[in-house]
Design a protein with these regions (language model features):
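Acidic/glycine-rich beta-solenoid
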Residues: 1-260
Length: 267
């Protein structure tokens, strides 16, 4: 399994008997290689038949993942960096101790599972100190009860189809059902056009026009043209996907390749 681009093997994949990815080798520009190894069923309650990832390494860094008995992730550890998570009996995340961002975040929810608050503190695994940021969210009390109405003072409004018409103070215009046609900003508008299948094919923002191209339903590339006082500049981007359909690389202006690199959870 793998991927070949312009005659060069860019990705090779190996799987175990349960079709879980166990190894990936990516050949980057210049010929350097990145090898990702995936291990299942080696941490805490995980068994050999679990689909939950236990650890991942790429030759430079490694990540270990732990879970509770419901399958909720409880910690990610990479060297001295650690992020721990706490979930409630409804499997909702209620606390995140993020040693990477040096923040601890608490979450609360309403009876429908909508987040109602997000409170940020300095990082600690223990007792919380002075709050740094307090974000609140409100929702409709009737009808479509998961429609957010406000976030920290920003209002949200919707049309009859549930499309947001005001998003954090920014007006949005919709057409033909659920197709976003226009975003109205302080400096002007951003306009969108679609084909007969509903795929976005053009975006116009000021003096910049972006056209999108597809292979079936998959975005294969875009061309961005900007008109300026010194002439017109054109930028092209081609997208390449791996055998699993994930974005693998993009080619910028036909000559420079950039690669998507993921952690064990696909981020």
């Amino acid at each position: 399994y793998g991927l070949t681009v312009d005659g060069v093997t860019r990705q090779t994949l190996e799987y175990d008997a349960l079709s879980r990815r166990t190894k990936e080798v990516v050949t980057l520009s210049g010929g350097s290689k990145r090898e990702n190894l995936y291990v299942f069923g080696t941490i805490n309650h995980l068994t050999d038949t679990d689909s939950l990832l236990g650890s991942m390494s790429n030759g430079t860094d490694s990540w270990n993942y732990t879970y509770d008995n419901a399958g909720n992730i409880t910690a990610i550890t990479s060297g001295e960096k650690r992020i721990s998570y706490q979930s409630d009996e409804l499997n909702q995340l209620i606390r995140e101790n993020n040693g990477v961002l040096n923040e601890t975040i608490l979450y609360t929810y309403d009876a429908g599972g909508n987040m109602t608050s997000r409170k940020t503190y300095d990082y600690t695994e223990g007792t919380l100190q002075t709050i740094k940021k307090n974000e609140t969210f409100t929702y409709r009390s009737d009808g479509w009860k998961d429609q957010i109405l406000s976030w920290n003072g920003y209002r949200y409004t919707y049309d009859a189809g549930g499309n947001p018409t005001l998003l954090r103070g920014v007006p949005l215009t919709w057409g033909e059902g659920r197709r976003l046609k226009k975003v109205s900003l302080s400096w002007g508008t951003v306009d969108f056009a679609y084909d007969s299948d509903g795929k976005r094919v053009k975006k116009t923002s000021g003096n910049t026009e972006t056209k999108y191209y597809y292979n079936g339903s998959i975005l294969s590339g875009l061309v961005r043209t900007t008109a300026g006082s010194t002439g017109t500049t054109k930028t092209t981007v081609q997208f390449v996907y791996d055998a699993e359909g994930k974005p693998f690389m993009l080619r910028f202006n036909g000559k420079t390749d950039y690669f998507y690199l993921y952690n064990g959870l696909g981020d």
